[in-house]
Amino acid sequence: NSDMVKDMELYKSSIPAKFGGRISSVLDINSREGSKEKFQGSASLGLLTSSLTLEGPLFNKKTSYIVGARTTYSDWLLNLLPEKSGYKDGNAGFYDLNASIDHRFDVNNSLTLTGYFSHDRFHFDEVERYAYQNASASLKWTHAFHPNLTGTFITGYDLYNNRTENTDNPATAYTLTFGIDQFYGKADFSWQAHDHH
């Protein structure tokens, strides 16, 4: 969801060690914090997709939240296709939800709780169906040990599920599922040798 993005950077080579020795390219996306000053939001409504983003302070100006959601409803477009296309009466769509709560204890400490969930599904006939699901949650503590030394500590959980169904022939029908789930933790330290570097 682009409304939730603060910045991003694409590494095609010379990938930093913090990404764990990836041999392919890496797209590093940083989500933004919600506004600690006022409640605000944005919404978009289109022929195929819609989105909504809300953000603002919680309880005081040290805590903020941001929530974003998107969905698509493209089935009606597939239904307009001619019968011979093979896609008429197909079904395709997705939805996702992002949420983040950030609390700044003082100038040296902040805590961020982030969650994400998405679901994609499609089929172009009644025989074969596909569905995908992603979920993640993380807790990040950022601490300034020194004006030039900052540490970031993250723990979290990731989940991915893939499901394929084929009911063309009862004798050969199948359901194939695949999933990955993992807990992780990592620490990253940033040292600025000089105020001008």
Protein language model annotation of sequence segments:
Residues V5, K36, L48, L58-K61, ...:
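Outer-membrane beta-barrel channels and translocator barrels
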Residues N108-Q182:
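Flexible loop and strand-edge segments within Gram-negative outer membrane beta-barrel domains
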Residues N1-K38, S42, S51-E55, K62:
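A beta-strand signature from Gram-negative outer-membrane beta-barrel systems
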Residues Y11, E55-P57, S100-R104, K140-A144, ...:
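Transmembrane beta-barrel domains of outer membrane proteins
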Residues Y11-S13, N30, S44-L48, P57, ...:
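Outer-membrane beta-barrel pore domains and translocons
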Residues S35-E37, P57-Y132, N162-R163:
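Periplasmic-side early beta-strands and strand-to-turn transitions of outer-membrane beta-barrels
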Residues I23-S25, F39-G41, L48-L52, Y95-A99, ...:
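Hydrophobic, lipid-facing positions within transmembrane beta-strands of outer-membrane proteins
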Residues G41-A43, T63-V67, L111-L113, G151-T155, ...:
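Transmembrane beta-strands of outer-membrane beta-barrel proteins
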